[in-house]
Amino acid sequence: MHTSLTVKNTVIGSGRTKIAVPLVARDAADLSSVLSQIKNLPFDIVEFRADFLECAGSIGEVLRHTQAVRDALPDKPLLFTFRRHCEGGSFPCSDDYYFELLDALIESRLPDIIDIELFSGETAVRRAVANAQKNGIAALLCNHEFHRTPPQEEIVCRLKQMEDCGADICKIAVMPQSSEDVLTLLSATLEAKRLVAKPVITMSMGQTGAVSRLAGQVFGSSITFGSGTQNSAPGQIGVSALRAALDCLESGAD
């Protein structure tokens, strides 16, 4: 049975596709500027991409900047993401530092949702998921393929693996090499809609895959990511344009 998740009155996995805006900044001044630019945009969730910070190697500084995001947008669900270089992020770091940072964010209870990379060691991942949920934070397990689109059955298998690890939300992003690859991702999303009980997020990246960011309500992807001031992944559509497109496609979905 498919279940939804409610975070700060935002229902994920039911009704209309929710829009998350990635927040990308280098330092405190940059962060303040970006926050002022995005605060009136039509989004549902803010994703703080802390791996873009120049101070990403300091847990204390990451916490301080996360607090600033929380203070600026107190009513928006906050997704904390620290994407490592091996999964397409900006900051290369060890497993030890990665999980130490996640633990600190979880213990701070600043985020509402925390991003955890699936292929970071099953024992450590399961422990982080349990710790997040113990502290009232939803665990989003994710995986990114920046060079290919796996077969449909492999995509579904990874989403199921995330659910089996205890995820509250399961996310995968893949890179298409052809239009057929986009269809593979959409078919996998539709299959996961039937097989995975937790909310699923999928996307086919780049210009070729942009249509997948608009088709969530039809195929079963619960959140789409739209750029505010700067893209955090290939193929992101501006938040305002994304909202307008979804308004046309999903009218009456609620």
From Swiss-Prot:
<comment type="subunit">
    <text>Homodimer.</text>
</comment>
<dbReference type="GO" id="GO:0008652">
    <property type="term" value="P:amino acid biosynthetic process"/>
</dbReference>
<feature type="binding site">
    <location>
        <position position="213"/>
    </location>
    <ligand>
        <name>3-dehydroquinate</name>
    </ligand>
</feature>
<dbReference type="GO" id="GO:0046279">
    <property type="term" value="P:3,4-dihydroxybenzoate biosynthetic process"/>
</dbReference>
<dbReference type="GO" id="GO:0003855">
    <property type="term" value="F:3-dehydroquinate dehydratase activity"/>
</dbReference>
<feature type="binding site">
    <location>
        <position position="236"/>
    </location>
    <ligand>
        <name>3-dehydroquinate</name>
    </ligand>
</feature>
<feature type="binding site">
    <location>
        <position position="83"/>
    </location>
    <ligand>
        <name>3-dehydroquinate</name>
    </ligand>
</feature>
<keyword id="KW-0704">Schiff base</keyword>
<feature type="binding site">
    <location>
        <position position="232"/>
    </location>
    <ligand>
        <name>3-dehydroquinate</name>
    </ligand>
</feature>
<comment type="function">
    <text>Involved in the third step of the chorismate pathway, which leads to the biosynthesis of aromatic amino acids. Catalyzes the cis-dehydration of 3-dehydroquinate (DHQ) and introduces the first double bond of the aromatic ring to yield 3-dehydroshikimate.</text>
</comment>
<feature type="active site" description="Proton donor/acceptor">
    <location>
        <position position="144"/>
    </location>
</feature>
<keyword id="KW-0456">Lyase</keyword>
<keyword id="KW-0028">Amino-acid biosynthesis</keyword>
<feature type="binding site">
    <location>
        <begin position="47"/>
        <end position="49"/>
    </location>
    <ligand>
        <name>3-dehydroquinate</name>
    </ligand>
</feature>
<dbReference type="InterPro" id="IPR001381">
    <property type="entry name" value="DHquinase_I"/>
</dbReference>
<comment type="pathway">
    <text>Metabolic intermediate biosynthesis; chorismate biosynthesis; chorismate from D-erythrose 4-phosphate and phosphoenolpyruvate: step 3/7.</text>
</comment>
<feature type="active site" description="Schiff-base intermediate with substrate">
    <location>
        <position position="171"/>
    </location>
</feature>
<dbReference type="GO" id="GO:0009423">
    <property type="term" value="P:chorismate biosynthetic process"/>
</dbReference>
<dbReference type="Pfam" id="PF01487">
    <property type="entry name" value="DHquinase_I"/>
</dbReference>
<comment type="similarity">
    <text>Belongs to the type-I 3-dehydroquinase family.</text>
</comment>
<dbReference type="InterPro" id="IPR013785">
    <property type="entry name" value="Aldolase_TIM"/>
</dbReference>
<protein>
    <recommendedName>
        <fullName>3-dehydroquinate dehydratase</fullName>
        <ecNumber>4.2.1.10</ecNumber>
    </recommendedName>
</protein>
<dbReference type="GO" id="GO:0009073">
    <property type="term" value="P:aromatic amino acid family biosynthetic process"/>
</dbReference>
<keyword id="KW-0057">Aromatic amino acid biosynthesis</keyword>
<dbReference type="InterPro" id="IPR050146">
    <property type="entry name" value="Type-I_3-dehydroquinase"/>
</dbReference>
